[in-house]
Amino acid sequence: GFSPRVAPELDDVPIEHADQADETDMGFLTRLARLHDAVTKPVGERYVLARRGQVKAISGQELPVITLSVPPNNQPSEMAFINATVDRSSRVRFQGVRAAWFDGEEGVEATVEQGAGPFKRLRQSYQSAGEASAAAGGELRKIKRQAAKLRIECPGNPELAAEGLIQLDDTWPSYMRGEWSLDRVTARGSRRHGYRCVLEATWPEGREGD
């Protein structure tokens, strides 16, 4: 079996009640993690729960940052070709989150807010103010983290992995430079283009608002 490890900032997040039905233990934990913009996965002999977009490994250890450079002759016909896009379409849509909870003592539905307007309202109604506030905070972190979404197609590198970090150096346009947190890494291979990777990344925690 695995030894559990929970990031300190998630250790005291309130969960009043959650039902597990027709899903594996891993699926159940993944569903709970997503509610708080977190990720859960096995790492060695540990099963770890931590925030998405953190500037550290899921195991709690600092990750090496992999630097990517645009090659001098960046042409599609070259094996070293890099293609990248940044989507900032959701940057200013919401600045805050509202979540509802049922106040049993008063017999009314109440709301809590995280951030400032314009607000996104969560559809689910929560069982306590603490649970609603935690859910709103997790959604707000997700909104800030995904304010910029980076997609890169580049030469393959086995060190590139989800939850890792990349650094785009001065060979990149100014609006792309800096650290990014990898959300997904997809490896591809073909005779024509060789071993390639498609990277999907967002801002790491602490960089939001660049």
Map each language-model feature to its residues.
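An acidic/polar, Gly/Ser/Thr-rich interaction patch typically located in mid-to-C-terminal regions
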Residues: 74-210
